[in-house]
Each structure stands twice: as structure tokens, then as C-alpha cells.
């Protein structure tokens, strides 16, 4: 399993707008592509000083599945123009990690 991690930052004034864009358009668009090997996506958010940081964590079966999503140079960040319009800055490249262990909680 491969975890693809990416960070983007925006202003507090644009944070809710960006979150809605992710959840209502961008994530839906990714799901609608029906990429074989795409397992899901998480969205994290926190305030950092005068900015709001967002982190996306995508899970894929393999690097081949990541390439189906991002292209041959799979580390390049996939940032739609609508997102660029509300972000103040963002990672140009995503980080990829092998998921080596995963455990559930008590709940």
C-alpha cells in the first residue's frame, strides 16, 4: 500500500471555501475517475499562525496506481486551477510512503 501525502496552505478567509471545493468537487472528481488501485483519501486541517494548512492523504495499492492518478512523474502535485486560485502556497511535489503497518482501535 502506498500513501501519497500533500500539503497546501490558504488564508483563514479562504479556508472554508477551499475545504468545500475539495469535498464537493475535487474529491468527487477523483472518485469518478474510478482509478484501479485507488483506495481512498483523507483531509486534515489545522490553523498555523496566520494560515490554515490542509493535508491530503491518498491511499493506493501500488505506485502503478499512483501513476494512473498523477502521471509518469508521479511525485508532481495534482492541483486543479480552482484550488490554486484560493491557495496561498502549496507543495509542488507529493511525498510517497510505503504503508508498513496499520491497526484498528478499540472502538
Report residues per predicted region:
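Glycine-rich beta-strand-turn "strand-cap" elements at beta-sheet edges
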Residues: 39-52, 78-107
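Non-catalytic surface loops within mature trypsin-like serine protease
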Residues: 12, 60-62, 98-101
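Acidic/proline-rich low-complexity IDRs
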Residues: 20-21, 43, 58, 86
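Short, well-ordered beta-strand segments in beta-rich or mixed alpha/beta enzyme
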Residues: 3-9, 40-74
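Glycine-rich loops and low-complexity Gly/Arg-rich segments
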Residues: 29-34, 65-69, 80-85, 93-94
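Short acidic, gly/pro-rich beta-turn/loop elements at beta-sheet edges
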Residues: 16-18, 51, 66-68, 104-106
